Amino acid sequence: MIHWRSGTVREIGRARRGAVRLTVVVDGADTPALALPELVGTPEIGDTVLLNVSALRRGLGTGGHALVVANATRPPADPPPAPGHIVKARYTPLQQMVLTLEEQESPHHEAMREHSAVAAGDLQGMPVVVAELHSALPAVLAGLRSARPGARVGYIMTDTAALPFAQSDLAAGLVDAGWLDTTITAGQAFGGEHEAITVHSALLAARHVLGCDVAVVAQGPGNAGSSTTWGWSGLATGDVLNAVHVLRGRAVVVPRVSASDPRERHLGLSHHTTTVLSRVLLGSADVVVPDDATAPWPQVRAQLDAAVTASSGTPRVVALPSAGVGDDLATSPVPLSSMGRSATQDVTPFATAALAGRHAAALLP
C-alpha cells in the first residue's frame, strides 16, 4: 500500500553524495522529502515531484521524510552507456541495472571466477564483524582503528533493511572521513562503491579482490521488527554468520544490548541476539562483551552463556576489558545513536560494538 502525493519543491536543503533533502509543499503544507539523484535526478526549486509518503504518515522512525519517486517537471536524462546487466530492486518501478563484481563485464570477473581462494570459498581466516543494527558500524570502526589504525576495512551492506546505500547519512559520513576503504552492497541493496549478487561473493571479493583485512557486515538503516520470535530483519545476521563459517572466516558477533530500552525483550541482551546464537547459528563465532562487574554486564554475560549452551553451533563468549572504550567512541566522525538513544544516554550498544572491533583487530596477523 502506497500513499501518493504530488507537491512543489520550495527549498533545496542539505545535499551529500547520493542524496538531497528537500522541502516540498504538499496540500499547502511544508513536507520534508528525500531525493536520491541516481534514481530520480536532482530536483530544482519549483519542480513538481511525485512522492511516496506512506512511511512519513505512519511516523516510522528511520525515515522521517517523504521519498521522491519521480520529477514530473524535468525527468533525468538517460544515463550514458555503461557495462552491467544485473538488475537490482528487481521488478519494482525503480529497478536498475548495475555492474556487479561477479558478472562477465566486470574487470573483476576473472578474479571472481579464477582466483583459487575465491573458487574454493576460502576467506583464509579474515575477521568479519557482524552486527544487527546499522548504528553499530561507527563504533565497530572506532574500536578497530584504535587497535589497528592501518587496517583496510570494507563495509558490506545487506538487503534486509534500506536498499539504497545513499539512504545512510552514517555510511556517507564514514566514507567521507576515510574510515571505510571500500563499500559493497549485496543482494538487492545497491549504491555502494561495488555491487555483489550475494553476501558470499561480497565477502570473498572484499578479501581477495579488494584487499580488505577486515569486513564489517550489517544491514542498512531501517531495521524491521514485529515483537515476534522470527519476524525481524536482523535475523539474517545468523545467515551471514553461517556464510562466514562456510567460507572459513573468523566471525565476530556484535551482541545487541541495552541498559535502557523500555522493551523488556531488548533489555540487557536482546532476544534478537539470543535467537541468532541459540537457534540460527550453525558454525563458530566469537561473541564479544565487556568483562565489567557493573550492570548490566553480569546479566548480559549470563544471558549469553545460556544462549551459547543452547546453540547448535559453536559460539564462544569473549569477555574483554572495556578501559578506553569511551576514548575510542569519542573519535567517531559521525554521531552515535541507536534506537533513538545517544551514547551519552546509553553507551552499552556502542561499547560492545567497539570491543568487537578491537577483537577483530586482535585476530589479524
Give the predicted meaning of each segment.
Residues P43-L51, A55-L56, L60, A89-T92, ...:
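Long, contiguous hydrophobic alpha-helical segments, chiefly transmembrane helices and signal peptides
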Residues I2-V26, R145-G150, F165, D169-A218, ...:
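Non-transmembrane, aqueous-exposed alpha-helical and coiled segments at domain scale
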Residues R58, A162, S260:
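Flexible, glycine-rich phosphate/dinucleotide-binding loops
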Residues L39-D47, G63, V69-P83, P127-A131, ...:
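Accessory terminal and edge-of-domain segments that mediate assembly/interaction
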